[in-house]
A protein has these predicted regions:
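Glycine-rich, phosphate-binding/catalytic loops in enzymes
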Residues: 28, 47-49
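CBM-like, beta-strand-rich accessory domains located in the C-terminal region of large
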Residues: 49-250
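Carbohydrate-active enzyme catalytic cores, enriched for enzymes
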Residues: 1-38, 90-92, 228-229
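Glycine-rich nucleotide phosphate-binding loop and flanking beta-alpha elements
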Residues: 18, 46, 74
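Catalytic Cys-His active-site segments of thiol-dependent hydrolases/isopeptidases
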Residues: 39-44
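Catalytic-core segments of enzymes that bind and process phosphorylated/nucleotide-bearing substrates
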Residues: 32, 45, 69
Length: 250
């Protein structure tokens, strides 16, 4: 920060104005705490559109986004929404950001995007709302509220920064680096957390990778928190003061 201390950083992607250089990362986040990365995305990969690695780094699941039925978000020009941010406010030190996207199609995640045609896509009527609540050095909360015309499966993906690893428990997920515990992930649902941990997966699809230089992929931990239904809410807290913060639920 300006005083030379370890910085806090949160970015929220709330725009889609052009197909150019666009990944399937609507309402995705990047997160640093105490000057060190916590959440990142898979990065950039060489412009070899048919290559599996390139398809992966552009995908929804390669970002800290909500994946729907294993599909990617549409990047067709007809689906450009401009600015999806409903509000971004600060009350005291606490930041509130909310975005909403109305989706009419989902795109297969295994086809190079320059070869995707309209008939490959999944028609849908989905209203997707994401609320982020951030109190620096204390906690980060992500709440996804999804309404669909039919039952669907939803996965909140969190891709960890290099050097950060996860340990899954029944009620929480511990994130740590080589020196210390960084934070604890807790579900805001009343039922046990329904999460999977992936690192360097190749089959049935790439997951748990990032590219440090645009030419290779390296392994990293990737966490998927799942729910299903027509109307689902997934609430997740990154608790940075895990020894002090009381447990809460939606």
């Amino acid at each position: 920060d300006k005083e030379g201390g370890s910085g806090e950083y949160l970015a929220f992607n709330g725009s889609f104005f052009s197909r150019q250089h666009k990944h399937s990362d609507d309402m995705g986040i990047q997160f640093f705490s105490d000057g060190k990365g916590v959440l990142t995305d898979a990065g950039f990969f060489a412009y070899l559109y048919d290559q599996e690695e390139r398809i992966f780094v552009e995908s929804t699941r390669a970002h800290n986004c909500l994946e729907i039925d294993g599909f990617d978000y549409s990047r067709f020009n007809i689906d450009i929404f401009g600015n999806c941010i409903d509000f971004a406010e600060k009350i005291g030190d606490c930041v509130f950001i909310q975005g909403t996207v109305n989706r009419s199609r989902l795109v297969p995640a295994n086809i190079p995007y320059n070869k995707v045609k309209d008939w490959h896509c999944e028609p849908c009527q989905i209203k997707q709302k994401r609320l982020v609540i951030y109190l620096p050095s204390k906690f980060l909360i992500i709440i996804d509220d999804i309404k669909s015309m039919k039952n669907r499966n939803y996965t909140q993906w969190f891709n960890l920064s290099p050097g950060v690893s996860a340990v899954l428990g029944k009620e929480e997920i511990v994130l740590r680096d080589s020196n210390e515990v960084r934070c604890v992930i807790r579900s805001l649902q009343k039922d046990p957390i329904n999460a999977s941990l992936v690192n360097g997966q190749e089959e049935p699809r790439l997951q748990g990778w990032f590219s440090p230089n645009g030419n290779i992929l390296e392994k990293t931990d990737s966490i998927g928190i799942e729910r299903a239904g027509k109307h689902s809410i997934i609430g997740t807290m990154f608790d940075l003061e895990f020894e002090k913060t009381p447990k809460i639920a939606l």
